[in-house]
Structures are given as structure tokens and as C-alpha cells.
Curated annotation (Swiss-Prot):
Organism of origin: Pelotomaculum thermopropionicum (strain DSM 13744 / JCM 10971 / SI)
Entry annotated with the keyword Transferase: no
Stated role: One of the early assembly proteins it binds 23S rRNA. One of the proteins that surrounds the polypeptide exit tunnel on the outside of the ribosome. Forms the main docking site for trigger factor binding to the ribosome.
PANTHER family: 60S RIBOSOMAL PROTEIN L23A
Source domain of life: Bacteria
Lineage: Bacteria, Bacillati, Bacillota, Clostridia, Eubacteriales
NCBIfam families on file: PRK05738.1-3 (NF004359), PRK05738.2-4 (NF004363), PRK05738.2-5 (NF004364), PRK05738.3-2 (NF004366)
Protein family: Belongs to the universal ribosomal protein uL23 family.
UniProt key word Ribosomal protein: yes
Protein name: Large ribosomal subunit protein uL23
GO biological process, one term: translation
UniProtKB keywords: Ribonucleoprotein, Ribosomal protein, RNA-binding, rRNA-binding
Cellular component, GO annotation: ribonucleoprotein complex; ribosome
Length: 95
């Protein structure tokens, strides 16, 4: 089994992800090879909460130009995790 800290890369803090906190949904960038079961187990193990549902999506990188040289930002995988009623992740509190 993979280390849970290798599966969860970093939390996503955007206006949309902050508004999802009201529905008890938390957003993370995760390892692209991780599946929903691994993401669920990682969140439960790291934050000591119960996960009800995991939604994942692959986000394509954008085309960028630096000094007229085209490049691309990396693709990544994003997971929206819904927690059981009453559970919270302290990392996101206070936003």
C-alpha cells in the first residue's frame, strides 16, 4: 500500500473550493495514479475523519508561453472528498 502522504499532494484553496466547505466537501490535488479507495483511506488515516464520498477529475494542463516559447503546465488529478456529518478537517478551518 502507498503512503497516504504520497497520495494527497496538497489542498486546493480557491473561491470555489472554499464555498464547498459549507457542504462538508474538501478539495485536494492527489497522485494521478491513485484511485478513489486509496484517496478515501488516505484522508481517513491522515485527518482521522470518516469519508462518505470521493469524486475525482483529471485536469488538463494549460498552454503557456514564456518568451515566445510554447510550454505546458502539468496535468493533475483533483479529488473532492465529502465527509460524514459533524467531521471537520482543521487544516481548512478559519478560511
Amino acid at each position: 500500500m502507498k503512503d497516504p502522504r504520497d497520495i494527497l499532494r496538497k489542498p486546493v484553496v480557491t473561491e470555489k473550493s472554499t464555498s464547498l466547505l459549507q457542504d462538508n466537501k474538501y478539495t485536494f490535488i492527489v497522485d494521478p495514479r491513485a484511485n478513489k479507495t486509496e484517496i478515501k483511506e488516505a484522508v481517513e488515516k491522515i485527518f482521522k475523519v470518516k469519508v462518505e464520498k470521493v469524486n475525482t477529475m483529471r485536469v488538463k494542463g494549460r498552454i503557456k508561453r514564456v518568451r515566445n516559447i510554447p510550454g505546458k503546465t502539468p496535468d493533475y488529478k483533483k479529488a473532492i472528498v465529502k465527509l460524514r456529518q459533524g467531521d471537520k478537517i482543521e487544516l481548512f478551518e478559519g478560511m
